[in-house]
Amino acid sequence: GRHWLDVVRFGESSGELTVNDDKPRSNAWRFRDAVIRALNEDVPFDQFVRFHFVPDKKNKELGQFIHLGTRLQDNANPNDKQFHRLDDMVATTGVAFLGISFGCARCHDHPVDPMSTEEYYQLTAMFWDQVKETPKAKRKTIPLEINEPRVLGKGSWRSPKQTVQPGFFKVLN
């Protein structure tokens, strides 16, 4: 199980760089134990992968996979948090399940990447409802600037472009 947990970037804590800010994730063990249980029960790999995105009752903890990524501090701008979490979900999905890195596609089309910028944001649109950032910060409220999936110019929420619908990238179709 340890190797799979490494692939999906599992961590028992928030991963903050300073010791005082590195907080344990109270329910992270549920995902870890579900991975170990599924592997010990020889769950076929196609089912194991499917349970990460659409878990059944017995394997519902495997659905936590998509929420295991980075967590920015509570006082961080919710717009930054929203798009960093979406990027983390897409990046982890690409590396863990497809063996492909999508790093460049967030900001620009790249000649050797299999995904265009628009296709990248279509993939983030698939995870859009999974990211529920509360627009708050210490002593003030910061509104969410973007409330629907969009292509972002140079990967920044400050430069929204056209809206996108959920979709996958053409190279695998």
Summary of predicted features, one role per range:
Residues 1-153, 159, 163-173:
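Short, structured secondary-structure elements
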